[in-house]
């Protein structure tokens, strides 16, 4: 596999270059290669037979976990990343559904809840195996699964998205070729490794010979701590959700002065608000900003566009860009028929980045994946349209609601609320106590203002909204907060916000 061979070459050519670093920890390319060899040999001793069962890797982003990822695939097994935010009950379901036989964990972690269901070993114990390696013909093959990411399932049980070595290689080659990330750059990692945004940091970094700078969980939740850490990092490449960088932008100190070497920002996982893009262009004039799009089932991202002031001026919402060269993206109607350019429907992705399907879930796989003109395709469940070859994503089809007979997109309403001069950030939640939407609630982080009463602020925002939205799309209720709740993955936590707002 090209990715693994590239890491091996870096280990031989630049053995003392850091592949990974975090507070007080580092791992050179030579150490990464040699330790992952030892881990692979130890794994093969623990799991006998031809069955290539998945291996759970449990912990947080640190050297031994990356060693465990590579050790697993060198031993011929896919890995399942499980970070500390995943509750034990969910881990037990993942073990049961995946058929995993081995769990590798970081030192000092309590795993009592799953200990009886699966063989467990600390990453440190694996590395006690002196010497040892496996031959390259034991590595995960191109058509075999490299990693499995578990996402939420509509049944309440997590579903495992299988990403093959070929899927990952297609993605990594694209990032290294089409984005300014090569040449030993320093990449940010802030996403937990059970979220596939972390794949955008990790593997392009390792293939290009860069250094992955992982910020601590404490820093992720505290901007002041984060900025102190980043100031010393020499960071070049920033990858995150828009929500995470929006939180950083709330501090005026987040700018090119803080990160003088930052030259590339890449966003994925959510809609990139125009206001965030504008602020970044102002704060980081030396950097290029890229909006990307893709579901986990299509290996992180499959479209991109560089965001400039010219791009911003051409449309109310930002495009997610053009398909990567080896992919085909089209729009389908409810009957599964392709739609012409400009018409709205469901985004469908076809090509070598599309997952082989859900592990052990043939019915779910058949529902979401299908063959299209000789290519494997995935129905995303995202609404969008194509204009002049560029894809515009309009959020989830299941973010569409019906209120008083009108069908509307929550994200369209959010866009207009965020455009208000009085709004720093906002989320719109439907109030539907009996399954039917009765009205809309806007949860808002306000800008500084001179109003003495909240109702005065609400009136001012509603007056602005009335200029761009019909009355039935304007939220009835406005709730003011000091921040917008986010999930461990750095996305807006709509479920939690809804629960808090409705109390």
From Swiss-Prot:
Its main location: cytoplasm. ATP binds at residues 151-152, 291-296, 382, 407, 491. One of its GO terms (biological process) is lipoteichoic acid biosynthetic process. Keywords: ATP-binding, Cytoplasm, Ligase, Nucleotide-binding. Pfam families: AMP-binding, AMP-binding_C. The keyword Nucleotidyltransferase does not apply. It is found in: Cytoplasm. Its EC number is 6.2.1.54. GO terms for molecular function: ATP binding; D-alanine [D-alanyl carrier protein] ligase activity. CDD domains: DltA. Signal peptide: none annotated. It catalyses: holo-[D-alanyl-carrier protein] + D-alanine + ATP = D-alanyl-[D-alanyl-carrier protein] + AMP + diphosphate. D-alanine binds at residues 196, 300, 491. Pathway: Cell wall biogenesis; lipoteichoic acid biosynthesis. GO terms for cellular component: cytoplasm. InterPro entries: AA_adenyl_dom, AMP-bd_C, AMP-bd_C_sf, AMP-binding_CS, AMP-dep_synth/lig_dom, ANL_N_sf, DltA, DltA-like. Catalyzes the first step in the D-alanylation of lipoteichoic acid (LTA), the activation of D-alanine and its transfer onto the D-alanyl carrier protein (Dcp) DltC. In an ATP-dependent two-step reaction, forms a high energy D-alanyl-AMP intermediate, followed by transfer of the D-alanyl residue as a thiol ester to the phosphopantheinyl prosthetic group of the Dcp. D-alanylation of LTA plays an important role in modulating the properties of the cell wall in Gram-positive bacteria, influencing the net charge of the cell wall. Belongs to the ATP-dependent AMP-binding enzyme family. DltA subfamily. This is D-alanine--D-alanyl carrier protein ligase.
